[in-house]
């Protein structure tokens, strides 16, 4: 990462890392759906360790679960000290991406097949995050209606 990405302490801004996560999640979502996609939500962006100027950053994305027109993409960010080759897991994020047709409307996307134990775990956890998001939305709407 370069100096333009950093604050005055030499840490890469969190917003720069978030932008990378969004870009890579979008690529994974397009590859899976074959459609244009938009970001609908970003859940639990966790910054575990700082990224410093001069480190190499690797961003990996996996489609964890698919619903009718949306999917959850898990993103893992790692930084590497190029002098020592030490690799550190620095950030994790979960993004909900929505596939769009040519008219900009949500469109159905193909399911994924969770085969391995890890894929099944990711799919279960994605469903829990989705259920929590939808329940929170419902609670907020009910609260707004009472006000």
Task: Give the location of each predicted region.
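Short amphipathic
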Residues: 1-2
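Surface-exposed, Lys/Arg-rich phosphate-binding patches that contact polyanionic backbones
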Residues: 5
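Anion-recognition interface
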Residues: 10
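Conserved G/P- and acidic residue-centered "switch" motifs that form tight phosphate/ATP-binding loops
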Residues: 13
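Active-site helix/loop of acyl-thioester processing domains in fatty-acid/polyketide metabolism
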Residues: 16-34
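Small beta-barrel nucleic-acid-binding modules, principally OB-folds
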Residues: 34-52
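HotDog/MaoC-like acyl-thioester-processing domains
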Residues: 52-56, 64-147
């Amino acid at each position: 990462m370069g100096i333009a990405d950093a604050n005055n302490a030499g840490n890469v801004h969190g917003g720069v890392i978030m932008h990378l996560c969004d870009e890579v999640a979008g690529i994974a979502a397009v590859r899976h759906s074959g459609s244009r996609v938009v970001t609908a939500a970003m859940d639990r962006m966790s910054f575990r360790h700082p990224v410093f100027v001069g480190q190499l950053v690797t961003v990996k994305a996996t489609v964890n679960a698919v619903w009718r027109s949306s999917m959850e993409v898990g993103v893992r960010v790692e930084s590497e000290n190029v002098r020592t080759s030490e690799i550190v897991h620095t950030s994790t994020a979960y993004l909900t991406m929505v596939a769009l047709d040519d008219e900009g409307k949500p469109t159905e996307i193909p399911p994924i097949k969770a085969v391995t134990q890890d894929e099944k775990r990711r799919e279960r956890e994605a469903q829990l995050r989705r259920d929590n998001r939808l329940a929170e939305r419902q609670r907020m709407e009910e609260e707004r209606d009472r006000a």
